Amino acid sequence: MAAKQVLFSDEARAKMLDGVNTLANAVKVTLGPKGRNVVLDKSFGAPTITKDGVSVAKEIELEDKFENMGAQIVKEVASKTADVAGDGTTTATVLAQALLTEGLKAVAAGINPMDLKRGIDKATARLVEELKALSKPCSDPKSIEQVGTISANSDATVGKLIADAMAKVGKEGVITVEEGKGFEDELDVVEGMQFDRGYLSPYFATNQENMTTDLENPYILIVDKKISNIRDLLPILEGVSKSGRALLIIAEDVESEALATLVVNNMRGVVKVCAVKAPGFGDRRKAMLEDIATLTGATFVSEDLSMKLEETNMEHLGTASRVQVTKDNTTIIDGAGEKEAIAKRINVIKANIAEANSDYDREKLQERLAKLSGGVAVIKVGAVTEAEMKEKKDRVDDALHATRAAVEEGIVAGGGVALIRAQKALDGLTGENDDQNHGIALLRKAIEAPLRQIVSNAGGESSVVVNQVKANQGNYGYNAANDTYGDMVEMGILDPTKVTRSALQHAASIAGLMITTEAMIGEIKEAAPAMPMGGGMGGMPGMI
């Protein structure tokens, strides 16, 4: 086991603060409408230019191990805020730095760190309640557009794209961000339910030019097994043939002999049919097949549910107004499932999302929810260069997360004003002793830091602006984009309540832990052994 170095008290806290300041100073230059970019060196490819706080924080590793500990702890604030709210990482970092700087000064002056932390925790709980009281619902397209615009660094086109996407697929719908192929931003909306499985044979294609299969008002059979014997399908095929309608088969697989029979019957015009593989794998496949069955009004044919393929008849088939199948995707439009059954299924998925432990599971459940409840919107980001593309895609991602957070918990006045207005909730709040009171006063001052940083990044005098904002009431604040004062909500400068709340809670939590740190332990790097000298080369005869 390698030897360890131990730092105590003021020496440990000073090192930790140096690391925090290095990281926070790099992150906070990105805050506000006049925040600057940060260039990140990459081990391969061109450098990345970004204005995304969490991207900057993730890149920082310091040489001094004790300073690096401080930086990594504050990096956790940014990452956690991004995970929970999707935005607000820079605000969280600025708050953590302000709290820690003032907190360590107080500890050095002899204030008890544990009571200081208790005071901060007490004040944080009161501020969170006040932020929720100040919050207003965000449901109309204009508010959604404004939140998206602010989070995308005042880019109105991005705000409008997100508002349009939400209007088309609903607030529960899946909206994804991809790199586009052109210079302009685009919005593509996939109506109905789409899954990434295409036809099992190109001979099912009805449109030879586009190689697509278009089925109007088809029957839909959903099976959770491989179809190997065509005899199992005969009752269904005969019934569909008599009806004169088409049939879409969704199964785990269709083996070669059965597939060949289906292709031949399709080409001869005996029955118009198309077979596709079921989407997903394992339990997720079964869940997705049940979703499709609910959407189309079909009975899910599964041996787990004591149903065999050979026992199925026309009553077990679902329908949809239209189905389009390509070599890669299948889209079911306007399924004939009962609205009550679909709503019930949606509620089950929502409950599963609430209980999901991993981000991956949550994302997949969210996709299933969207496919059942409306569709999928894809925002394709356009740019001239690859560097601009990456930077813009980060901003659009931030804006999308912010608008989702706004829809979930509502909005408050932006530009740091909500935190200033929440200060009044601390009036009359007292702790059990003077040291706790100092913690409350410390947080009251620290929550001015985001507004001060926005003003500093815009080249203004922060104390003058903060005093001007505090002298007024309501949504009155400072618009750093054009150096004016006014009603922040009317000017469209809004922050999601969830983002502001998460930033405050995570910053206060981490700062409290760091203030109460008394020792730091790090590994001592062993000096690399010197290289041995190489042996001399023997001379050759006859050489001088």
Swiss-Prot record:
A cellular component annotation (GO) from this entry: cytoplasm
Alphabetized PANTHER family for the sequence: 60 KDA HEAT SHOCK PROTEIN, MITOCHONDRIAL (PTHR45633)
NCBIfam families on file: GroEL, PRK00013.1, PRK12849.1, PRK12850.1, PRK12851.1
Name of one Pfam family that matches: Cpn60_TCP1
Protein name, UniProt field: Chaperonin GroEL
Subcellular localization: Cytoplasm
Residues given in the record as ATP binding sites: 30-33, 51, 87-91, 415, 479-481, 495
Keywords: ATP-binding, Chaperone, Cytoplasm, Isomerase, Nucleotide-binding
A molecular-function term among this protein's GO annotations: unfolded protein binding
HAMAP family tied to this protein: CH60
Function per UniProt: Together with its co-chaperonin GroES, plays an essential role in assisting protein folding. The GroEL-GroES system forms a nano-cage that allows encapsulation of the non-native substrate proteins and provides a physical environment optimized to promote and accelerate protein folding.
Taxonomy, superkingdom: Bacteria
Enzyme class, spelled out: isomerase
Annotated EC: 5.6.1.7
Major subcellular location class: cytoplasm
Family affiliation: Belongs to the chaperonin (HSP60) family.
Reaction it catalyzes: ATP + H2O + a folded polypeptide = ADP + phosphate + an unfolded polypeptide
One Gene Ontology term from the biological process aspect of the record: protein refolding
Lineage: Bacteria, Pseudomonadati, Pseudomonadota, Gammaproteobacteria, Thiotrichales
Quaternary organization: Forms a cylinder of 14 subunits composed of two heptameric rings stacked back-to-back. Interacts with the co-chaperonin GroES.
